[in-house]
A protein has these predicted regions:
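Hydrophobic targeting segments
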Residues: 1-6, 22-23, 31-35
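Short, well-formed alpha-helical segments that are part of the catalytic scaffolds
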Residues: 11-25
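Short, high-confidence coil segments that cap the C-terminus of an alpha-helix
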Residues: 29, 78, 105-107
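A conserved acidic beta->alpha catalytic loop
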Residues: 34-44, 58
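Active-site acidic Asp-centered loop
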Residues: 37, 56, 84-86
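Glycine-rich, basic loop-to-helix element that forms the pyrophosphate-binding segment
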Residues: 57-75
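Short beta-strand-to-loop acidic/aromatic patch adjacent to the donor-nucleotide binding site
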Residues: 77-89
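Conserved donor NDP-sugar-binding/catalytic core segment of glycosyltransferases
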Residues: 93-107
């Protein structure tokens, strides 16, 4: 089980939606956080109740924005959290392989 965070700034919603749909196909993904550092509130598409949109109303920076989602994962006792950029391409088998590797190499 893992959560995923994607930091956004004036996002290309088509790109974000494509990535999010691919992540949602993976049974290991519990929640996806869209953390938006854009200067104005955007109307995000609704894809799933597994996606949480967080609008910061300012550009906190890449790391600080991901930390918001990571804190939620810690609070929810999710053992793993994946930090990704919105322009990557993934498949569910990649997430499964990554999670298996992490579980086998926790040192």
């Amino acid at each position: 089980m893992l959560n995923v965070s994607i930091v956004l700034y004036n996002p290309d919603w088509k790109q974000v939606t494509t990535l999010t749909r691919a992540l949602l196909e993976c049974s290991h993904v519990r929640r996806i956080y869209w953390v938006d550092n854009s200067p104005t509130l955007q109307e995000p598409p609704v894809l799933s109740n597994q996606v949480k949109y967080i609008f910061n109303n300012q550009n906190l920076g890449y790391g600080a924005a991901h930390n918001i989602a990571i804190r939620e994962s810690i609070y929810d006792d999710i053992p793993f959290h994946l930090v990704v950029n919105p322009d990557i391409v993934v498949t569910s088998d990649v997430i499964t392989t990554l999670l298996q590797f992490i579980q086998q190499h926790q040192e």
